[in-house]
């Protein structure tokens, strides 16, 4: 029989007591009551913050959007296929935030800045909250620097400044994305960091945009944030805030940034879907009551910062899609009232072959004229006036049979100016060349050129000016105005090229 040795037992117990390390871990845990359609109702979570990140037992992350008396309404940011009634949920104590920094430039990421381009992890040491307060009045400076789009019609008549919010609005298939992409391409070499946010678009469309940016060397200063049509509504709702947060990091470092939200109609639809599933009361067009705040708190983050904060800027180009040209619908009117102007793209003009299809009549820039360079101001005023008169005369000329010579001349010039503003996709024009083309159009240099030859004349003249009078470009770029010397060089180049062109035609 084995004898029991008390001293051995007591030494084992003593050893166990010495090694015992008590760790008390308090977690805020809840239980899933119901789950479906990307929404979970959770019971038992106390002290949860609004917009706090919650973690489900299968690893899915959600955001607490509805804090009710007896349960929490959570929007899932993943599939959540393995979730079921009774699953446990724990609060993380963190509000939605994303990693930011230089490492994101040139990458394609999702709404939580997870890479989706297969180029490995993004190394970042800093995070920023998705919902940051917009700069206050004292922290801002009025817009005064130009944000050149490279599109003649916009830079001349609807100029955009750094720190401005300019809405691009129009029906589907009118070239809204093309205007935004051209603007990004035109920032090459200017030191502007661009963020392109694709919301609820087909993955193939986003891939096409990324290819265009890569082929033209624009991806090296651009971040693409993609929340595709197949992604959960929560990610489509968050993507614009992610884009703003990524740009904000650079803005507060004193850099100029440009953010394109393509498009906010889809974000509003994703938010409507989430709100209705969370049983929030619907308002006009079934959107929730706070859909205005959804967009205003996003677009107010665009700013030109004061010298004390480093004079960085965030320029926002939100895109909104209209149905059959109806700009008086709920989301379009909301965003028009928030932004500092809008570029209206018309399907009628697009189908008539005028591309970019900008309707100059109802497009406006509320602060951009202060940001125009003097050279452009010198020539743009006359262009606006002549085009406005042409539109009036054209409507009148449809009914009149015989027109006097002056009216015929004005109509002919208007048609040539219209041709002058046509521009192929993905080919932005430098501002000094835009000034030269508008000068040629408004000062009668195109009057003898047949209307159907204007496009080839302008393309050839740009090349001729660049090669024969390189000093003209240097003068306009350095002085920012069309001085006597620059104007003299431009006139001689126009006269010489016009003679050659007419001789060849």
Swiss-Prot record:
Position of the signal peptide: none
Keyword ATP-binding: yes
Keywords assigned by UniProt, alphabetized: ATP synthesis, ATP-binding, CF(1), Hydrogen ion transport, Ion transport, Membrane, Nucleotide-binding, Thylakoid, Translocase, Transport
Subcellular location: Cellular thylakoid membrane
SUPFAM superfamilies in alphabetical order: C-terminal domain of alpha and beta subunits of F1 ATP synthase, N-terminal domain of alpha and beta subunits of F1 ATP synthase, P-loop containing nucleoside triphosphate hydrolases
Annotated EC: 7.1.2.2
Site (Required for activity) location in chain: 363
GO CC annotations on file: plasma membrane-derived thylakoid membrane; proton-transporting ATP synthase complex
Assembly and oligomerization: F-type ATPases have 2 components, CF(1) - the catalytic core - and CF(0) - the membrane proton channel. CF(1) has five subunits: alpha(3), beta(3), gamma(1), delta(1), epsilon(1). CF(0) has four main subunits: a, b, b' and c.
Name listed for the protein in its UniProt record: ATP synthase subunit alpha
């Amino acid at each position: 029989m084995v004898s029991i040795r008390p001293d051995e037992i007591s030494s084992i117990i003593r050893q166990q007591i010495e090694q015992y390390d008590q760790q008390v871990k308090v977690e805020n845990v809840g239980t899933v009551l119901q789950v479906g359609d990307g929404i979970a109702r959770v019971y038992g979570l106390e002290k949860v913050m609004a917009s706090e990140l919650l973690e489900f037992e299968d690893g899915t992350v959600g955001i607490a959007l509805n804090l009710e008396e007896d349960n929490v309404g959570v929007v899932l940011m993943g599939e959540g296929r393995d979730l079921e009634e009774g699953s446990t949920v724990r609060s993380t104590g963190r509000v939605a935030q994303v990693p930011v920094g230089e490492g994101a430039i040139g990458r394609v990421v999702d709404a939580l800045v997870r890479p989706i381009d297969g180029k490995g992890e993004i190394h970042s040491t800093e995070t920023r909250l998705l919902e940051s307060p917009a700069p206050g009045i004292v922290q801002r400076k009025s817009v005064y620097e130009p944000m050149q789009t490279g599109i003649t019609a916009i830079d001349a008549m609807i100029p955009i400044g750094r720190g401005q919010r300019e809405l691009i609005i129009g029906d589907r298939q009118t070239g809204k994305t093309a205007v935004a992409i051209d603007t990004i391409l035109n920032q090459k070499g200017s030191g502007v960091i661009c963020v392109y946010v694709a919301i609820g678009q087909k993955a193939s469309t986003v891939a096409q945009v990324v290819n265009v940016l890569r082929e033209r060397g624009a991806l090296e200063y651009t971040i693409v944030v993609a929340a595709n049509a197949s992604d959960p509504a929560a990610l489509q709702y968050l993507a614009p805030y992610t884009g703003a947060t990524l740009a904000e990091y650079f803005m507060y470092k004193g850099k100029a940034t440009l953010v394109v939200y393509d498009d906010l109609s889809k974000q509003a639809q994703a938010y409507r879907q989430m709100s209705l599933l969370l049983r929030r009361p619907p308002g006009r067009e079934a959107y929730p009551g706070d859909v205005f705040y959804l967009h205003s708190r996003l677009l107010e983050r665009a700013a030109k910062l004061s010298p004390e904060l480093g004079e960085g800027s965030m320029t926002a180009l939100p895109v909104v899609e209209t149905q059959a040209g109806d700009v008086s619908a709920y989301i379009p009117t909301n965003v028009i009232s928030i932004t500092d102007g809008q570029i209206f793209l018309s399907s009628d003009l697009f189908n008539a072959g005028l591309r970019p299809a900008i309707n100059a009549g109802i497009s406006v820039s509320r602060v951009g004229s202060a940001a125009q360079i003097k050279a452009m101001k010198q020539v743009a005023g006359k262009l606006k006036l002549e085009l406005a008169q042409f539109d009036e005369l054209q409507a009148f000329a449809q009914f009149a049979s015989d027109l006097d010579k002056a009216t015929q001349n004005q109509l002919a010039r208007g048609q040539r100016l219209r041709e002058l503003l046509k521009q192929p996709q993905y080919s932005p024009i430098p501002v000094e060349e835009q000034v030269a083309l508008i000068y040629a159009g408004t000062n009668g240099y195109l009057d003898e050129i047949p209307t159907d030859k204007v496009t080839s004349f302008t393309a050839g003249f740009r090349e001729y000016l660049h090669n024969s009078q390189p000093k003209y470009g240097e003068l306009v770029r350095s002085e920012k105005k069309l001085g006597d010397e620059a104007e003299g060089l431009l006139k001689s180049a126009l006269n010489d090229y016009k003679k050659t062109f007419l001789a060849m035609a």
